[in-house]
Amino acid sequence: MSLRSLFVAGLATLALAAPAPQIQARQGMSSNELESGPCRDVTFIFARGSTEQGNMGFIVGPGVCSSLKNDLGSDKVACQGVGGAYTAQLAPNFLSQNTDQASIDAATDMFDLANTKCPNTKIVAGGYSQGSAVIDNAIQALDSDLKAKVKGVVLFGFTRNVVDKGQIPGYPKDQTKIYCALGDLVCDNTLIITAAHLSYGADADDAAKFLASKVQG
């Protein structure tokens, strides 16, 4: 069986066994508070993992958004998922950037929108699985002024963890927190999916506290 087949089979099998307690959560959710809502003090941009539905997914994105609002105030945070050309398909995981350029561009568009629509907002970001590669590559592509407005980033099941040496190249390491669960082989530069890769919902509160500390500092 090829590595690609293992990746697809692993996702299919483990998705059925994922510990998501609610059917609604399994279906994923979307948040477009930057695109459709008023400017808020903090904007959280998130890219979901492969095959997750909605633009926030269900494994960890909605949890970080909810916890961040609890920490900072629901009227202070706008949550925005990366959608559009980023359709979270499986195949782009096998490309050199662990995603495709169209998906990276979809994320950079969200950073650009936050900057132009809400110039005073503090930007934080996160990504899970393929979404971690989307955010990683997007932040590298930002110009220096916009990159400086990104106050903190959290990455879960970081597919480029080995390649990028546990950081986002060109972005401050102390503003980045990477979550790689014990037994998550994706963090070891493989695309083999284990149960550990679906465990990051448990880290949502901690990730939100990290991001909150960066915008409050």
Curated annotation (Swiss-Prot):
Q: What is the lineage of its organism?
A: Eukaryota, Fungi, Dikarya, Ascomycota, Pezizomycotina
Catalysed reaction(s)? cutin + H2O = cutin monomers
Keyword presence, Secreted: yes
Q: Where is this site: Transition state stabilizer?
A: S50, Q130
EC number annotated for this UniProt entry:
3.1.1.74
- Protein name per Swiss-Prot or TrEMBL: Probable cutinase 3
Gene Ontology biological process: carbohydrate catabolic process
Tell me which family the UniProt entry assigns to this protein: Belongs to the cutinase family.
Give the source species.
Neosartorya fischeri (strain ATCC 1020 / DSM 3700 / CBS 544.65 / FGSC A1164 / JCM 1740 / NRRL 181 / WB 181)
Q: Which Pfam families does this one have?
A: Cutinase
What is its subcellular localisation? Secreted
Cross-referenced InterPro entries: AB_hydrolase_fold (IPR029058), Cutinase/axe (IPR000675), CUTINASE_1 (IPR043580), Cutinase_monf (IPR011150)
Quote the catalytic residue positions. S129 (nucleophile), D184, H197 (proton donor/acceptor)
Which molecular-function annotations from GO does this UniProt entry contain? cutinase activity
Keyword annotations: Disulfide bond, Hydrolase, Secreted, Serine esterase, Signal
Q: What is its main location?
A: secreted
Highest taxon in the source lineage: Eukaryota
Which Cys-Cys disulfides exist here? C39-C118, C65-C79, C180-C187
